[in-house]
């Protein structure tokens, strides 16, 4: 584990010129402030540095704006993109008057959720492994002005470009709709770009595994090794940052919107999770699919609280355009071994050490600190209250008769519904003071502004359906 002294030595050894302090806002966006290296000493790791929190949506008012960034030396890494040698350090956000974690800091909430596992005696380590998908386009144009609303996307990979005239000719080899998983180049047109993305992540300290094209045209995924909950959330922020940066360098644009394209697969973020205690996997046992009773109760908690969790794991109005039947989206709240149509899947493994739950409804717009923490708190509530998840569903849920489908609960159908469920079902999040009413209320208020803007804005499809009526 790196200490402040280790970081200061690394600054000297690498001839670092600047130190970039980063933190995550409630919406999940990485924010930063850059210091000349002369401002970085042991004191900043002990006392932090002040900043104005009033400009961060969902945080403090202007009359109480002072906040404290506390650098976490464990996260120090060199940014591979900046012209001047720059060290990046992820920060916690503290209340300057008390030195306590700020109750609305997503990273602080994630750390408190991890601590709950220990305080309950359930385990001592939580491992998380997200699989975040994304799109890369050559060009994106959008307008949301009152008299000009719409968007346009383009990528040389899109099947709509089979007859487009290109300088040097059109060479074909397009990825067909839902046909991107996963032919070799030249159909897979950004192999080298993904390799650079993965390499940049590795340079920033992320343990990387693989990369590949995804199902939709222009859709991709990079693989990371699992890690402990808060560190994995840190790594997911690096993941998004590297993808945006490398795409930009290539003259392209990456997006983590769950459903930018109608009629093709959306981008999900399946999240694998497990708990360990004294070096042993808590989720391994002799019940269904070689799971422990504790794991089944964990799944029961996820299913019971899924609609409230959606507010964090699927935090955009666009998220619910992905969560519809027919595009491999896990809308049904059921669990199964190997069945990818269930929202909670138990991946097959012969090793007890690899026993885990894969929650499939989250998407990559989720704030990773809040999304991971909310799922963990739901699972812990399931363990505490021995919530029965019911029988496993081992048949293809996509092909069930309508009458059977009606008996299976589903995730939320809109962000408004998710926020309403969060408002009603919040007690499990507040256990141990992990989340509190102040944060939940402020988050609902922040997200409702997005809902209301979306609901009040006329949509191009409405003109298509109703203009001449």
From Swiss-Prot:
Broadest EC class assigned to this enzyme: ligase
Organism (species): Bradyrhizobium diazoefficiens (strain JCM 10833 / BCRC 13528 / IAM 13628 / NBRC 14792 / USDA 110)
Family, similarity comment: Belongs to the glutamine synthetase family.
PANTHER family per UniProt: GLUTAMINE SYNTHETASE
GO biological process, one term: glutamine biosynthetic process
Main location (coarse class): cytoplasm
Molecular function, one GO term: metal ion binding
Binding site for Mg(2+) 1: 131, 270, 358
Name under which the protein is recorded: Glutamine synthetase
Residues annotated as binding Mg(2+) 2: 133, 214, 221
Entry binding sites for ATP: 209, 272-274, 340, 345, 353
Modified residues (O-AMP-tyrosine): 398
């Amino acid at each position: 584990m790196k200490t402040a002294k280790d970081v200061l030595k690394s600054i000297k050894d690498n001839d670092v010129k600047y130190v970039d302090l980063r933190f995550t806002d409630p919406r999940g966006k990485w924010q930063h402030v850059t210091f000349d290296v002369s401002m970085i000493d042991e004191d900043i790791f002990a006392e932090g540095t002040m900043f104005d929190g009033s400009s961060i949506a969902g945080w403090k008012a202007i009359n109480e704006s002072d906040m404290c960034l506390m650098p976490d030396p464990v996260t120090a890494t060199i940014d591979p993109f900046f012209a001047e040698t720059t060290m990046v350090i992820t920060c916690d956000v503290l209340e300057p008057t008390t030195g306590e974690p700020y109750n609305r800091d997503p990273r602080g909430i994630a750390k408190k959720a991890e601590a709950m596992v220990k305080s309950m005696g359930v385990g001592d380590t939580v491992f998380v492994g997200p699989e975040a998908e994304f799109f890369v386009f050559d060009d994106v144009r959008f307008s949301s002005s009152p008299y000009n609303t719409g968007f346009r996307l383009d990528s040389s990979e899109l099947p709509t470009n089979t007859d487009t005239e290109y300088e040097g000719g059109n060479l074909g080899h397009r990825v067909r709709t839902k046909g991107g998983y996963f032919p070799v180049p030249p159909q897979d047109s950004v192999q080298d770009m993904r390799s650079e993305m993965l390499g940049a992540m590795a340079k920033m300290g992320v343990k990387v595994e693989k990369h590949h094209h995804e199902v939709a045209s222009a859709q991709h995924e990079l693989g990371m090794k699992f890690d402990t909950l808060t560190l994995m959330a840190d790594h997911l922020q690096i993941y998004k940052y590297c993808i945006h940066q490398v795409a930009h360098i290539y003259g392209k644009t990456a997006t983590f919107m769950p459903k930018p394209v109608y009629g093709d697969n959306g981008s999900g973020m399946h999240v694998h999770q497990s708990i360990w205690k004294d070096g042993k996997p808590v989720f391994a046992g002799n019940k269904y699919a070689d799971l422990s009773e504790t794991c089944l109760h964990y799944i029961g908690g996820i299913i019971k609280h899924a609609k409230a969790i959606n507010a964090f794991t699927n935090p955009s109005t666009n998220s619910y355009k992905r969560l519809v039947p027919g595009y491999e989206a896990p809308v049904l709240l059921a669990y199964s071994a190997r069945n990818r149509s269930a929202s909670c899947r138990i991946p097959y493994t012969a090793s007890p050490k690899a026993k885990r739950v894969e929650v499939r409804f989250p998407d990559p717009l989720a704030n990773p600190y809040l999304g991971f923490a909310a799922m963990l708190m739901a699972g812990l509530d399931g363990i505490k209250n021995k919530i029965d998840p019911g029988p496993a569903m081992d048949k293809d849920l996509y092909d069930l008769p309508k009458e059977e489908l009606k008996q299976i609960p589903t995730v939320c159908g809109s962000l408004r519904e998710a926020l309403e469920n969060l408002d009603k079902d919040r007690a499990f999040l507040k256990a141990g003071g992990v989340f509190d009413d102040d944060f939940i209320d402020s988050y609902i208020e922040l997200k409702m502004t997005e809902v209301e803007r979306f609901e009040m804005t006329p949509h191009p499809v409405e003109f298509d359906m109703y203009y001449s009526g």
